[in-house]
Regions:
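Short coil/turn motifs at beta-sheet boundaries
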Residues: 30, 51-55, 90-92
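Short, intrinsically disordered, mixed-charge
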Residues: 13, 65, 77-81
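Small/polar-rich, solvent-exposed N-terminal microdomains that initiate assembly or binding
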Residues: 1-44, 50
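Acidic-leaning, charged glycine-interspersed low-complexity segments
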Residues: 74-101
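Short, cysteine-centered beta-strand-loop-beta hairpins and adjacent loop/turn segments enriched
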Residues: 44-45, 66
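Short, conserved charged micro-motifs
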Residues: 67-74
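Oligomerization/assembly interface segments of phage tail-like spikes and tubes
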Residues: 54-65, 93-101
Length: 101
């Protein structure tokens, strides 16, 4: 299982920016384009009453001033990623994805 810090580095690499935020407090002023992400669940595989595989699911929100930011397609190229929805709020485009990492 990869660490959250490894995920942070991978997201920064794909975004080509350090504007990647894990569960940011409301006091943080985000810079765009940005990726905001948080842990959503941990899937567990069991056999013989023993947990043997854990996979963490993260909800990622790509926030951009323009529609269709290229990083979305880069994220979808990662294994175990899926596109959930898109919406606009405060003149910013939001693309929401799920990633198991």
């Amino acid at each position: 299982m990869a660490s959250r810090q490894e995920l942070q580095s991978k997201l920064e690499e794909l975004l080509e920016s350090e504007h990647v935020y894990y569960d940011p407090p409301e006091s943080i002023k985000l810079e765009y384009p940005a990726i905001v992400y948080s842990k959503s669940k941990i899937a567990t595989k069991r056999a013989d009453d023993t947990a043997y595989l854990f996979r963490t699911s993260y909800e990622l929100t790509v926030i951009s001033r323009r529609p269709d930011p290229p990083v979305v397609m880069k994220l979808l190229a990662l294994p175990y990623s899926s596109y959930d929805r898109a919406y606009e709020s405060d003149n910013l485009h939001h693309e929401v994805l799920t990633l198991y990492y």
